[in-house]
Amino acid sequence: MAWIPLLLPLLTLCTGSEASYELTQPPSVSVSLGQMARITCSGEALPKKYAYWYQQKPGQFPVLVIYKDSERPSGIPERFSGSSSGTIVTLTISGVQAEDEADYYCLSADSSGTY
C-alpha cells in the first residue's frame, strides 16, 4: 500500500500595516492512494476573509487549486474541493493520486485581494 505525504507548512500572512493574521495547518497528512485527504487551516481571520489554497511541487511555482473558499479554477481536477466553517477551512482531495503529492498552502484574502 502506497502512502502519499501531503506536507503542510505553517503560514503566517499580514494584511497591510493594520494587523497580522496567523493561519495554522497541521505539519503533514498522509493518505493511501485512492483515499480521501482532508487538509485543514484555521485562523481567526477566516470568517471575515476568503481562503485560497495553493499546491506546490518541488522545483515548481505554486498552483492555485481553490479560491474564495470553495471555487475551483479551470483545469483543476474535480477531486479538489474546498469548504469553510467558522474559523476553519478545509481542502479535500477525493481519490488521492500520486501526482497530488505536494506542499499545500492556505492563505486568506478579502474580496479586494488584500492578504
Swiss-Prot record:
One of its GO terms (biological process) is adaptive immune response. Residues 51-67 are annotated as: Framework-2. Residues 107-115 are annotated as: Complementarity-determining-3. Residues 42-50 are annotated as: Complementarity-determining-1. Gene3D superfamilies: Immunoglobulins. Residues 20-41 are annotated as: Framework-1. Residues 71-106 are annotated as: Framework-3. Residues 1-19 form the signal peptide. Residues 20-115 form the Ig-like domain. It is found in: Secreted; Cell membrane. It comes from the Eukaryota. It holds the Pfam family V-set. One of its GO terms (cellular component) is immunoglobulin complex. Keywords: Adaptive immunity, Cell membrane, Disulfide bond, Immunity, Immunoglobulin, Immunoglobulin domain, Membrane, Secreted, Signal. Disulfide bonds join C41-C106. Residues 68-70 are annotated as: Complementarity-determining-2. The keyword Iron does not apply. V region of the variable domain of immunoglobulin light chains that participates in the antigen recognition. Immunoglobulins, also known as antibodies, are membrane-bound or secreted glycoproteins produced by B lymphocytes. In the recognition phase of humoral immunity, the membrane-bound immunoglobulins serve as receptors which, upon binding of a specific antigen, trigger the clonal expansion and differentiation of B lymphocytes into immunoglobulins-secreting plasma cells. Immunoglobulins are composed of two identical heavy chains and two identical light chains; disulfide-linked. This is Immunoglobulin lambda variable 3-16. It comes from Homo sapiens (Human). The lineage of its organism: Eukaryota, Metazoa, Chordata, Craniata, Vertebrata. The gene is IGLV3-16.
